[in-house]
Amino acid sequence: MSPQTETKASVGFQAGVKDYKLTYYTPEYETKDTDILAAFRVTPQPGVPPEEAGAAVAAESSTGTWTTVWTDGLTSLDRYKGRCYHIEPVAGEDNQWICYVAYPLDLFEEGSVTNMFTSIVGNVFGFKALRALRLEDLRIPPAYTKTFQGPPHGIQVERDKLNKYGRPLLGCTIKPKLGLSAKNYGRACYECLRGGLDFTKDDENVNSQPFMRWRDRFVFCAEAIYKAQAETGEIKGHYLNATAGTCEEMIKRAVFARELGVPIVMHDYITGGFTANTSLAHYCRDNGLLLHIHRAMHAVIDRQKNHGMHFRVLAKALRMSGGDHIHSGTVVGKLEGEREMTLGFVDLLRDDFIEKDRARGIFFTQDWVSMPGVIPVASGGIHVWHMPALTEIFGDDSVLQFGGGTLGHPWGNAPGAAANRVALEACVQARNEGRDLAREGNEIIREACKWSPELAAACEVWKAIKFEFEPVDTIDE
């Protein structure tokens, strides 16, 4: 060993392994306005103290690795490291803690959800010292928010484009989701739109399969839109799914949709990826297309309470990446979603400023600094009897989407659409008159049945349909 090497080793670098908490657990740290803050639900392995587990999360999701490295001396760890600054036990759990981590903003590329998630929810989730790890919430600082375009248009611009105000929008997913020819698919869209719906929708797994290639579907759906608009005098739309195997193909499909003059396209943002989604959102803003977002694959990530990532984080990420609608659960339908928790992330999608509210699962105050809002879409196992509850829970700035609840009507698609439209208009009118939708909902629907045979038939078919299962993911007591 040369004398120069000996001198450097003796003065600075000390090889070996040391506890993460010696560097990354800093309870005295005062968070900065520019920090990205994260709340992790941490379940350590037996024998691992929570301080070490929380520090390990901060280290492995920022600058740290399993051993000391000499290149630490070539940068400022104090400037760039993540810090576990607070730990609190989870009520009712013996071995779970909420660990709060602050990340300096310089760790992340501007305008890139992909880069943000690669660090914060990257390899650390496979760390052996942790039995389980879940990201519960993120605080995105205004300094980072302003590097994102966000939704292509937002709620108010969509209202203005559609010229529809004062009520939720109505949609329908075309069923069966796979197997129809393009012409029959377009016919189903036309019947639903003519019957009174605002939108019809491709299901998330409708891309370009042998039974129905994307270009044929786009053409027949555009024909359905224009025909229904001419007959009803209302602006109509169909969520044309542009999701594809490559970004180039996805943009090609969006370009064709724009050439057809339709108002909206669709993307599966988790399976498609955040880079693809952000690219499509930029194209949609530049070319006047609304963007509907489906969350296929979300439950793989967010359903288990002790591991993965809560949907409120995926919802925030979508607002940053870009989308005008996103599926959010229904509370009352067939899919997972507790009421207060769902309303918490619905507010995070729509509102400009959201206060911390642990009772609704919101760990941090979030200021979106005028980033456009996203319309939540309630979809999955809902029908006309749910209309009062959906109107009361989600309010006007929402899309209520009835697939089977439209196409399953005994008289056909158009009567199914009419039944939903009548039920919605009745609920909105009753609410505007001061009636209590939660208490009087069934009575309101029965009254409307007297002057709508389509609604009466729908009510008879689905009068006994319920999905009464306890949610897996609940708010901590």
Curated annotation (Swiss-Prot):
<feature type="binding site">
    <location>
        <position position="327"/>
    </location>
    <ligand>
        <name>substrate</name>
    </ligand>
</feature>
<dbReference type="InterPro" id="IPR036422">
    <property type="entry name" value="RuBisCO_lsu_N_sf"/>
</dbReference>
<dbReference type="Pfam" id="PF02788">
    <property type="entry name" value="RuBisCO_large_N"/>
</dbReference>
<feature type="binding site">
    <location>
        <position position="177"/>
    </location>
    <ligand>
        <name>substrate</name>
    </ligand>
</feature>
<dbReference type="GO" id="GO:0000287">
    <property type="term" value="F:magnesium ion binding"/>
</dbReference>
<dbReference type="InterPro" id="IPR036376">
    <property type="entry name" value="RuBisCO_lsu_C_sf"/>
</dbReference>
<feature type="binding site">
    <location>
        <position position="204"/>
    </location>
    <ligand>
        <name>Mg(2+)</name>
    </ligand>
</feature>
<keyword id="KW-0120">Carbon dioxide fixation</keyword>
<feature type="binding site">
    <location>
        <position position="203"/>
    </location>
    <ligand>
        <name>Mg(2+)</name>
    </ligand>
</feature>
<keyword id="KW-0460">Magnesium</keyword>
<dbReference type="InterPro" id="IPR020878">
    <property type="entry name" value="RuBisCo_large_chain_AS"/>
</dbReference>
<feature type="binding site">
    <location>
        <position position="295"/>
    </location>
    <ligand>
        <name>substrate</name>
    </ligand>
</feature>
<comment type="function">
    <text>RuBisCO catalyzes two reactions: the carboxylation of D-ribulose 1,5-bisphosphate, the primary event in carbon dioxide fixation, as well as the oxidative fragmentation of the pentose substrate in the photorespiration process. Both reactions occur simultaneously and in competition at the same active site.</text>
</comment>
<protein>
    <recommendedName>
        <fullName>Ribulose bisphosphate carboxylase large chain</fullName>
        <ecNumber>4.1.1.39</ecNumber>
    </recommendedName>
</protein>
<dbReference type="GO" id="GO:0004497">
    <property type="term" value="F:monooxygenase activity"/>
</dbReference>
<feature type="binding site">
    <location>
        <position position="379"/>
    </location>
    <ligand>
        <name>substrate</name>
    </ligand>
</feature>
<keyword id="KW-0503">Monooxygenase</keyword>
<feature type="modified residue" description="N6-carboxylysine">
    <location>
        <position position="201"/>
    </location>
</feature>
<feature type="modified residue" description="N-acetylproline">
    <location>
        <position position="3"/>
    </location>
</feature>
<keyword id="KW-1015">Disulfide bond</keyword>
<keyword id="KW-0560">Oxidoreductase</keyword>
<feature type="binding site">
    <location>
        <position position="173"/>
    </location>
    <ligand>
        <name>substrate</name>
    </ligand>
</feature>
<comment type="similarity">
    <text>Belongs to the RuBisCO large chain family. Type I subfamily.</text>
</comment>
<feature type="binding site" description="via carbamate group">
    <location>
        <position position="201"/>
    </location>
    <ligand>
        <name>Mg(2+)</name>
    </ligand>
</feature>
<keyword id="KW-0479">Metal-binding</keyword>
<feature type="active site" description="Proton acceptor">
    <location>
        <position position="175"/>
    </location>
</feature>
<dbReference type="GO" id="GO:0009853">
    <property type="term" value="P:photorespiration"/>
</dbReference>
<keyword id="KW-0007">Acetylation</keyword>
<dbReference type="InterPro" id="IPR000685">
    <property type="entry name" value="RuBisCO_lsu_C"/>
</dbReference>
<feature type="binding site" description="in homodimeric partner">
    <location>
        <position position="123"/>
    </location>
    <ligand>
        <name>substrate</name>
    </ligand>
</feature>
<feature type="propeptide">
    <location>
        <begin position="1"/>
        <end position="2"/>
    </location>
</feature>
<dbReference type="InterPro" id="IPR020888">
    <property type="entry name" value="RuBisCO_lsuI"/>
</dbReference>
<comment type="subunit">
    <text>Heterohexadecamer of 8 large chains and 8 small chains; disulfide-linked. The disulfide link is formed within the large subunit homodimers.</text>
</comment>
<dbReference type="GO" id="GO:0019253">
    <property type="term" value="P:reductive pentose-phosphate cycle"/>
</dbReference>
<dbReference type="InterPro" id="IPR017443">
    <property type="entry name" value="RuBisCO_lsu_fd_N"/>
</dbReference>
<keyword id="KW-0602">Photosynthesis</keyword>
<dbReference type="Pfam" id="PF00016">
    <property type="entry name" value="RuBisCO_large"/>
</dbReference>
<keyword id="KW-0113">Calvin cycle</keyword>
<dbReference type="InterPro" id="IPR033966">
    <property type="entry name" value="RuBisCO"/>
</dbReference>
<feature type="site" description="Transition state stabilizer">
    <location>
        <position position="334"/>
    </location>
</feature>
<keyword id="KW-0934">Plastid</keyword>
<dbReference type="GO" id="GO:0009507">
    <property type="term" value="C:chloroplast"/>
</dbReference>
